């Protein structure tokens, strides 16, 4: 099979299974790097590939999953040499069977900013080096797998596209709740990966076939019927005794049968699967054809955690725009991100579903500022963004660092703009707004605007932008200056919807500029536009009249099924007159000085800043409170309760890892102010307890452990982080020398569970007065108990809960 035939096969292709599983069975030594075996034991690696090929695999992943500069930093072999050897071994094994050799690429093992310290462009560069090495070695395709961070997957996809012309398959790993470790949804993955040019997308690792199936079904529903989809589930879950996985090859094949209905392009296995598993898949997929019946594609934009389906009127918050706002312009010139973030948070709370982002102001570097603002916004809010600029460089800077699928606002009918901006939208997978204007300006007649819109639509389709990603703005003119043209906008909008089959968008509030009681005009015009077919309304979400019109319209047009969203928003609302009476009563019964109920206490603004991840705001609020309150009082009465609130929401699944980490970052900003205040008073900083944490010997994965450290430190604990691949004796000696009474151990791989057990045994044998908590993807509560741990912590928040319980704080 040739790479150019990959997506024209009449039947579902079989992928391979677990390389790590096979190496472990072959006696891989603890701490050994599997990728170095490409050079030190090529016969072993080639034989494993050959067994998979003989079992029916026609895409074989080279033994390069962990081959990155980050993970091979202290290897005696270069990245290029390891990849070259890995591809060569794979191609030799593939040749007799006509199989393809894939450059297997996994995560770098380090969190990207803002959740970690790895810069996005550094990640792109590191992946670019990997891809170039694979191309030079003769890889037939690139297989990106086991990603949990959509931002890192974007970096990898850009690197593949910018450094090769090879086909690329992209896969993420999802947890049982339907999101990745960092909170990414299946739908956000589908929209983003497809937009960035992945040739096929899939789900691998984490769970078994039965658990992955509902997510795989959602993946197919989020993509065109012809778009290739694949799966590589685990052989179930790890056994509690660490002896392998709990699904046999026969049961695996049985649980894979429902996938026949999904029209998979390819199927294989991941952790715990062997050639015997793949052999049985031949019978499951022998007569299966890839692809599914076509279905109408939804118009979506997304961040990792929030995929917005533009079904019904969707509200785009307009407030991140400096036009006519002196305070906003000043904030942009001064680089005051706190002001921008406050606008984003307030619009989110008011009900915006997408945020328009415009940073064009006199005296600013718009491209640099667009990049800075996009990074800042996506570190705090989860809403998708609409990048609002006519400046191509500013758009590209924002598009490149955006995590998800955004909207570009905008392009117009001028040939130069079309030729410049549409390719950017295509490269970065963005939806696009087309303004019904060209070199002649805004034309008064509706039919002329529709003609421009048709030209924009046709150009976008020719550039490879799907129909569902094209939005037309027929341009709102002010009623005060061009009253006679107001209806033309509505008529043009309706015609675009009916004749061109595109989505529509309007900046609604422009209609009332220069007139009194603007909300009356805005709401009425919004209602007219909605009836004409408006999809996206750029407006102020703090306008209760306009928001009420949106929610009511979606009910009355049967878009809000069972009035669910309307009831959720308005069930507990009271009429304005009743609200006024209640406010007067509240004023008469205001809490006395010293009383601090949650809604009225002096700590509420600080707690909110922490909860929302606003580091600058949290620091400013802390400085103000320190003028009246004792430093440690702020810790106990505001910061810890705020972190507890965030932690509770994290456990309930109403917020996710990025928000948890940003809340911790905001709390850290407050803690720095508190430490300064304590130092100025000549007092020592009081630790709530000392904890040693480490990733055990042989395991080089430390993302989870690093997250635990951040959370523990923000709860006021002193953390001694020993790093990764930590020898048993180092843990024991540190606990003894530092007089530590709580230890946290982490392991991600089944091969290092024995090392964790040995570390726990050594701590017990040394008769040290300490308790031990353990965590990691391969651990279970039962196995933790079996190896002598005192607690199993499923995540960073639970680690903090254990520490609080242990130290009695």
What are these regions (language model features)?
Residues 1-473, 477-809:
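Domain-level signal for soluble alpha/beta catalytic cores
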């Amino acid at each position: 099979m040739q790479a150019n035939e990959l997506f024209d096969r009449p039947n579902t292709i079989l992928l391979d299974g677990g390389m790590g599983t096979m190496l472990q069975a072959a006696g891989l030594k603890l701490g050994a790097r599997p990728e170095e075996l490409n050079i030190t034991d090529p016969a072993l690696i080639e034989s494993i590939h050959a067994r998979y090929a003989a079992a029916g695999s026609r895409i074989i992943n080279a033994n390069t999953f962990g081959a990155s500069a980050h993970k091979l930093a202290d290897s005696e072999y270069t990245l290029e040499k390891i990849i070259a050897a890995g591809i060569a071994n794979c191609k030799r094994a593939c040749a007799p069977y006509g199989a393809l050799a894939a450059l297997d690429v996994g995560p770098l093992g380090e969190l990207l900013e803002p959740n970690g310290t790895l810069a996005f462009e550094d990640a792109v560069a590191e992946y670019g080096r990997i891809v170039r090495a694979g191309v030079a070695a003769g890889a037939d395709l690139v297989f990106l797998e086991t990603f949990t961070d959509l931002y890192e997957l974007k970096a990898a996809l850009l690197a593949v596209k910018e450094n090769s012309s090879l086909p690329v398959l992209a896969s993420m790993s999802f947890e049982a709740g339907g999101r990745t470790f960092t909170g990414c949804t299946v739908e956000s993955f589908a929209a983003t990966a497809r937009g960035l040019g992945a040739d096929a997308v899939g789900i691998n690792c984490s769970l078994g076939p039965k658990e992955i199936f509902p997510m795989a079904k959602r993946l197919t529903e989020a993509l065109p019927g012809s778009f290739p989809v694949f799966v590589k589930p685990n052989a179930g879950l790890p056994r509690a005794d660490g002896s392998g996985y709990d699904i046999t090859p026969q049961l695996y094949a049985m649980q894979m049968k429902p996938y026949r209905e999904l029209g998979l392009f390819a199927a294989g296995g991941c952790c715990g699967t062997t050639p015997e598993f793949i052999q049985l898949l031949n019978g499951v997929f022998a007569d299966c054809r890839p692809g599914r019946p076509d279905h109408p594609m939804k118009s979506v934009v997304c961040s990792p955690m929030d995929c917005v389906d533009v079904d019904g009127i969707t509200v785009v918050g307009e407030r991140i725009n400096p036009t006519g706002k002196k305070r906003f312009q000043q904030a942009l010139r001064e680089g005051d991100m706190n002001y921008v973030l406050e606008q984003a948070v307030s619009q989110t709370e008011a009900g915006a579903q997408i945020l328009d982002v415009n940073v064009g102001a006199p005296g600013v570097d718009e491209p640099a500022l667009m990049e800075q603002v996009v990074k800042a916004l996506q570190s705090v809010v989860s809403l998708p963004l609409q990048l609002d600029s006519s400046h191509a460089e500013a758009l590209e800077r924002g598009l490149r660092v955006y995590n998800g699928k955004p909207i570009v606002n905008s392009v117009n009918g001028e040939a130069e703009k079309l030729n410049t901006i549409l390719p950017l939208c295509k490269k970065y997978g963005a939806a696009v707004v087309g303004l019904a204007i060209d070199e002649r300006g805004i034309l008064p007649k509706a039919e002329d605007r529709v003609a421009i819109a048709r030209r924009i639509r046709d150009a976008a389709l020719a550039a490879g932008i799907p129909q569902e990603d094209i939005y037309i703005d027929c341009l709102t003119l002010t009623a005060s200056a061009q009253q006679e043209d107001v209806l033309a906008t509505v008529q043009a909008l309706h015609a675009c919807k009916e004749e061109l089959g595109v989505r529509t968008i309007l900046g609604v509030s422009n209609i009332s500029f220069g007139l009194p009681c603007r909300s009356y005009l805005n709401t009425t015009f919004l209602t007219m536009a909605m009836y004409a077919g408006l999809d996206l309304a750029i407006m102020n979400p703090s306008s209760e009249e306009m928001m009420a019109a949106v929610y009511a319209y979606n009910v009355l047009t049967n878009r809000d099924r069972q009035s669910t969203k309307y009831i959720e928003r308005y069930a507990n609302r009271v009429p304005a007159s009743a609200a006024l009476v209640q406010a007067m009563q509240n004023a008469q019964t205001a809490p006395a000085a010293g009383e601090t109920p949650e809604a009225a206490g002096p700590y509420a603004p600080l707690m909110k800043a922490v909860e929302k991840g606003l580091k600058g705001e949290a620091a400013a609020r802390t400085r103000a409170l320190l003028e009246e309150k004792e430093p440690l009082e702020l810790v106990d009465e505001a910061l810890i309760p705020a972190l507890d609130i965030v932690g509770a929401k994290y456990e309930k699944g109403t917020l996710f890892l990025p928000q948890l980490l940003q809340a911790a970052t905001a709390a850290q900003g407050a803690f720095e102010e508190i430490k300064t205040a304590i130092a100025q008073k000549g007092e020592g900083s009081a630790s709530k307890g000392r904890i040693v944490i480490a990733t055990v010997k042989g395991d080089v994965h430390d993302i989870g452990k690093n997250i635990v450290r951040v959370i523990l430190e923000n709860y006021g604990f002193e953390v001694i982080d020993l790093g990764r691949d930590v020898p048993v004796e180092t843990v024991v000696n540190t606990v003894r020398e530092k007089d530590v009474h709580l230890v946290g151990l982490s392991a991600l791989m089944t091969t290092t569970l024995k090392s964790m057990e040995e570390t726990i045994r050594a701590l017990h044998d040394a008769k040290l007065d300490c308790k031990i908590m353990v965590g990691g993807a391969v651990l279970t509560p039962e196995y933790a108990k079996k190896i002598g741990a005192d607690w199993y912590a499923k995540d960073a928040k639970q680690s903090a809960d254990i520490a609080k319980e242990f130290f009695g704080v």
